[in-house]
Swiss-Prot record:
FAD binds at residues 310, 329, 337-338, 342-343, 576, 742, 771, 786-787. Keywords: FAD, Flavoprotein, FMN, NAD, Oxidoreductase, Phosphoprotein. One of its GO terms (molecular function) is cinnamate reductase activity. This is NADH:(hydroxy)cinnamate reductase subunit CrdB. It comes from Vibrio ruber (strain DSM 16370 / JCM 11486 / BCRC 17186 / CECT 7878 / LMG 23124 / VR1). The active site is at 635 (proton donor). Belongs to the FAD-dependent oxidoreductase 2 family. FRD/SDH subfamily. Consists of three domains. The first domain (NADH:flavin or FMN_red, PF03358) carries a non-covalently bound FMN and is used for NADH oxidation. The second, FMN_bind domain (PF04205) contains a covalently bound FMN, that acts as an electron carrier between the two other domains. The C-terminal FAD_binding_2 domain (PF00890) contains a non-covalently bound FAD and forms a site for substrate reduction. Is flavinylated on Ser-257 by ApbE, encoded in a neighboring gene. Covalent attachment of FMN is essential for catalytic activity. It comes from the Bacteria. The modification FMN phosphoryl serine is found at residue 257.
């Protein structure tokens, strides 16, 4: 028989290891016992994938064995945290112990010989998700372990050896009988096609699962109501894995575990309808493709770490120039945070914007900006400030008191980016955007919009948008919703140009040769080593908005960041690219500043629920039904105001404002109303009752707001940009609460995106673009500027990387 024996401690000197080594030699004629160490398995973190190489090896060894022996010491009356962590890993996405025969033993210098630890271990192994088959009784407790072995590691007491033999031989019989019970029972499906439902983000997903007598033949999922992106990969890969292995023992996809399990559960329902116990298929081995762990090696001109907008832009630029590129993406699908955006990309385009009328109050917004005392403006921005004054004076002279077109220019974009980013933290440290970087952003944003159009992005040119906190209507919004338009166009272009995208492949370290960066070492989906030799590396891995501990570590702007704070970010945004940069001496800038998105879903942190309308149509009220802030203000201003009101607030809309929401459909609205996550009523009074407000208060607030819209001026909170009144039923209330949205700081870069070290000198062959880099947005980012940033500096990174290849 073949057994695996887990050394239940990371201690380099352990009597439990010595005990297992004794058993390995003593019983070699009876069984093959292989010792497994756990010293390289990280502490359990459900937000990280189960891809640690040592963990995967333990998993496969357990699956292939006839039984498992676990030797545990006793720490503070329980098992070591390292062993507990390994068992958590082995009961989360991996389940090799399910039904597996297990023998427990332990050695301790205490006379009781780990008895309390063994009791706890039995309870853990019996828990749902672990479900091991632990041999009852016959506990082997080796007390006074420091006296139990001779200098050759042999047990020195014959009675102890005799009892160990009794326990082990009983375990051999127990394992044989237990494994006979685990032999899969014969079954037959009732052939046919069965309709079930899986729960996706967009609601219930109809599924059709077809069976022959012995096989799952096909799985079809109707994804019409889902947003394109990571979910697409789930709906293809999970069914493919199930059919390949004829098993429900399929790993969930990182970043989409909820949707993955929904698909698996949906197929399990169909299996049951077809007359078979789904537990049989859950105990089957994983598909063969999930077991491939062969190391891989590649060579290219440029390797890009991160498959969001910045990374894909860099790769596409390299491919356009006839060079080759590889993109490494840690998640199962490309997209990063870009695919989760609202869609509009900021770029001053005066010729296009002149086709739109100015809105009430917009001219006043510019006048207020230009009234800033020059003593408050940093010297490098003064010339642009004065030039903007001249531009706007000419506009004023042209129209006077008459209604004009929507004014804009790269200078206005630049000054709004500058003023929008000027902030002072809790320690009195001030920050503002580096002029040379901001100038590149605002001068070249329109080129990025046009380049994306050439790549295949189609824009809705009938409307100009202002995202939340944008301060101005200059957003170019794609026809396709959210950030999907950018990611689909770029990934298809890269594929058409024979570029390579490796998903499920987090970068772990740089490949260093003769003191220079020569590529990247990554880990594949099954834990295999991926080595990429490259002439240049572009870091485009995003920020750290999904890493609460890192946010708390660097925070100097917010008085408190709670452990349970939500985020709008992809769960891939954990700051690993920043840490990777630091490993070669990269300098950091602006790390203490984090932007919150004020209008996030209070339960999930997402942006795509409720009615997400342009800020000129925002009507924000607190839980009492009163306005409390200028709805057109910057994101951190809105967030601070919301937090002062308790965090939770509501966006009020009517039927006309609803039509300006870019994130939804009537079907989705109806589902959310039914689920109680969006409120709808025929009168404002009824709406107030639904959300727990005094009807008279909400009605008075809305009446007052409507008067401000008519006048084009808000004397209460000085909102000066309006569009629609709230007057046509039905009326809506969308619950909102701030969530982490954008980490302002990151790696230091120059205008060519070279990563700078702590002495502001370039690190050879290393470039960075997107949220992983800092210095552009300073303390607060304008809505719509992130997309302008990633596509502008992503392209620059690709160009610079090519131009500086050896």
């Amino acid at each position: 028989m073949k057994f695996t024996a887990i050394v239940g401690t990371t201690s380099p000197k352990s009597y439990n290891r010595t005990l297992l080594q004794f058993m390995q030699a003593h019983f070699k004629d009876k069984a093959d016992i292989e010792l497994l160490e756990i010293d390289q398995v990280p502490m359990f973190n459900q937000d990280q994938p189960s891809t640690n190489p040592q963990l995967l090896e333990i998993n496969q060894k357990i699956i292939a064995s006839d039984g498992v022996i676990i030797a545990t010491p006793e720490y503070n009356h329980s098992i070591p945290s390292s062993l507990k962590s390994v068992l958590e890993w082995l009961s989360y996405e991996l389940h090799p112990l399910d039904g597996k025969p297990v023998m427990i033993l332990g050695a301790s210098i205490d006379a009781q010989g780990s008895s309390r630890a063994q009791l706890h271990l039995r309870q853990i192994l019996d828990a749902p998700g672990v479900n091991a088959n632990v041999m009852p009784g016959y506990e082997f407790l080796l007390g006074n372990a420091h006296q139990a072995f001779d200098d050759k590691g042999q047990l020195n007491n014959e009675a102890t050896i005799d009892f160990l033999e009794i326990c082990f031989f009983r375990f051999m019989r127990f394992a044989k009988i237990s494994n006979q019970l685990n032999v899969e029972e014969d079954f037959s499906f009732a052939p046919g096609t069965y309709e079930v439902h899986a729960l996706g983000h967009g609601g219930a997903l109809p599924m059709q699962v077809s069976f022959s007598e012995k096989k799952i033949e096909s799985i079809h999922i109707d994804t019409a109501g889902e947003t394109e992106g990571l979910a697409d990969v789930v709906f293809v890969r999970i069914p493919d894995k199930i059919i390949e292995g004829q098993t429900l023992n399929v790993d969930a996809l990182s970043g989409a575990s909820e949707t993955s399990h929904a698909v698996i559960d949906g197929v399990a329902k169909a299996v049951k309808l077809a007359g078979v116990n789904p537990d049989i298929l859950k105990k089957r081995p994983k598909p063969a493709s999930s077991l491939n762990r062969d190391d891989e090696e590649y060579s290219c001109d440029v390797v890009v770490i991160g498959g969001g907008g910045a990374g894909l832009s860099a790769a596409a630029t390299v491919l356009q120039a006839g060079k080759n590129a590889i993109v490494l993406e840690k998640f199962p699908a490309v997209g990063g945070n870009t695919i989760r955006t609202g869609g509009p990309i900021n770029a001053a385009d005066p010729e296009w914007q002149r086709t739109f009328d100015e809105n009430p109050g917009e001219r006043h917004t510019i006048e207020a900006l230009l009234s800033t005392d020059e003593s408050e403006i940093h010297p490098e921005y003064l010339a642009d400030f004065r030039a903007l004054k001249e531009e706007f004076a000419a506009y004023q002279q042209q129209f006077g008191d008459q209604k004009g077109y929507l004014f804009d220019s790269p200078l206005l974009h630049r000054m709004q980016t500058y003023f929008g980013g000027k902030r002072t933290d809790l320690e009195g440290n001030s920050i503002y955007g580096q002029y040379d970087l901001v100038k590149i952003l605002t001068d070249h944003a329109l080129e990025s919009v046009q380049w994306l159009e050439e790549i295949g992005v189609e824009y809705d040119k009938e409307v100009v948008f202002a995202p939340v906190g944008a301060l101005w209507r200059r957003g170019h919004k794609p026809v396709k919703r959210y950030g999907t338009a950018f990611i689909l166009a770029l990934s298809r272009y890269i594929e058409s140009m024979s570029g390579t995208i490796l998903t499920d492949s987090p970068a772990k370290e740089f490949l260093i040769e003769d003191g220079e960066i020569k590529g990247v070492i990554a880990t594949g989906v099954n834990g295999q080593k991926i080595t990429i030799h490259a002439k240049a590396v572009v870091l485009a891995s995003g920020g750290f908005g999904a890493n609460t501990k890192m946010l708390q570590q660097y925070n100097t702007y917010w008085s408190h960041i709670a452990d349970d704070i939500k985020t709008t970010n992809s769960y891939a945004m954990t700051g690993d690219g920043i840490v990777l940069g630091q490993s070669v001496g990269a300098g950091l800038i602006g790390m203490g500043f984090t932007q919150m998105m004020p209008v996030a879903d209070p339960n999930t942190g997402e942006l795509f629920s409720g009615l997400q309308v342009p800020p000129e149509n925002f009507v924000i009220v607190n839980q009492q039904g009163k306005r409390f802030v200028n709805e057109f203000a910057g994101r951190d201003v809105l967030t601070k105001a919301a937090l002062a009101e308790g965090g939770l607030f509501y966006l009020i809309a009517d039927d006309e404002i609803k039509k300006t929401a870019a994130n939804t459909s009537q079907e989705k609205i109806d589902r959310q109303v039914e689920a109680g996550t969006l409120f709808r009523a025929d009168t404002l009074e009824e709406l107030a009752v639904q959300v727990g407000m005094e009807p008279d208060v909400l009605v008075e607030t809305i009446n007052k707001y409507n008067r401000y819209v008519e006048a084009g001026h808000d004397p209460e909170f000085h909102k000066d940009t309006f569009s629609l009144k709230v007057e046509k039923a039905p009326f809506y209330a969308t619950p909102r609460q701030p969530a982490v949205h954008h980490t302002m700081g990151g790696l230091k870069i120059d205008t060519a995106t070279r990563v700078l070290n702590e002495n502001n000198r370039p690190i050879k062959h290393l470039y960075a673009a997107g949220e992983v880099a800092g210095g552009i947005h300073a303390g607060n980012r304008l809505g719509g500027n992130a997309l302008a940033d990633i596509f502008t500096f992503g392209r620059i990174a690709g160009k610079t990387a090519m131009s500086e290849m050896d």
